[in-house]
């Protein structure tokens, strides 16, 4: 399913203002101030297919049980949806979970599958190759998600949707294979692609996107990391060699 940045930009603007203080909010949960709020990025997991109950898995593998999940009964969360969660930690433990929390806010993060570029549905023209910066990225401990913090230019109006994709480009892979000097079997080659849909580059904006890694799950095992091609805002095409297939410390609870 294609989703544009316009769908999430309005909520993300508020979230990003909070994320500026992310290291301070997430440094630790203060035992002396149980009303202090923390912010984390997590994965929403349904407890069962027939239930609206859910829990959160943090990128360090720990789990959080939302004691007030009924308050979010009217919200539709897909299993595996990524989200920013603002919460208070509660003292009473819940069996089977690392944390018992009271949820204050949930902001969905754009969550997508990796796509393979082809000559039919996912063409070069449709996927696009407009400028974008990948300012920060990390892989969850279970290696199920790659999350990218990015910057791009646009009007940031709701009727101007941009599209993001993490792409397997077999044409480039075949070309690289012809030249042994450009082939590195220890890395998986991917491309972070942006289609601005000809939006006017009026203002610099930021956002977050998470990509599911199930399509390359088997290939990741035994690899050093990922080579991610990005057409940057100011420096042309760059390839980021990402070797830290673990969670950054600033996002640990």
What annotation goes with each model-predicted range?
Residues 1-2, 21, 219-221, 252:
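Generic structural signal for beta-strand residues in well-ordered domains
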Residues 1-9, 244-253:
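Single conserved hydrophobic/aromatic residue that forms the stacking wall/gate
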Residues 14-21:
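Sec-dependent N-terminal signal peptides
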Residues 24-27:
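C-terminal motif of bacterial Sec signal peptides marking the signal peptidase cleavage site
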Residues 29-31:
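Bacterial signal peptide processing site
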Residues 37-245:
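First exposed extracellular module after export/assembly in secreted or surface-exposed proteins
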């Amino acid at each position: 399913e294609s989703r544009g940045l316009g769908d999430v930009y309005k909520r993300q603007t508020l979230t990003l203002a909070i994320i500026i203080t992310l290291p301070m909010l997430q440094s630790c949960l203060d035992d002396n101030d149980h009303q202090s709020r923390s912010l984390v990025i997590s994965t929403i997991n349904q407890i069962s297919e027939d239930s609206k109950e859910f829990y959160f898995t943090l990128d360090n593998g720990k789990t959080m049980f939302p004691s007030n999940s009924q308050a979010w009964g009217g919200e539709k969360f897909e299993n595996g949806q990524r989200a920013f969660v603002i919460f208070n930690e509660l003292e009473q433990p819940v069996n089977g979970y690392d944390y018992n929390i009271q949820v204050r806010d949930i902001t969905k993060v754009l969550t997508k599958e990796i796509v393979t570029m082809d000559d039919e549905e996912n063409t070069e023209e449709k996927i696009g190759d407009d400028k974008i910066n990948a300012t920060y990225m990390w892989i969850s401990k279970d290696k199920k998600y790659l999350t990218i913090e990015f910057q791009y230019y646009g009007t940031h109006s709701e009727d101007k949707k941009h599209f993001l994709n993490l792409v397997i480009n077999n044409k480039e892979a075949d070309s690289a294979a012809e030249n042994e000097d450009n082939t590195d079997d220890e890395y998986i080659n991917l491309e972070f692609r942006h289609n601005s849909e000809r939006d006017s580059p009026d203002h610099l904006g930021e956002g977050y996107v998470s990509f599911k890694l199930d399509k390359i799950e088997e290939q990741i095992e035994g690899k050093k990391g990922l080579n991610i091609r990005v057409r940057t805002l100011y420096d042309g095409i760059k390839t980021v060699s990402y070797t830290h297939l673990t969670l950054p410390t600033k996002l640990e609870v």
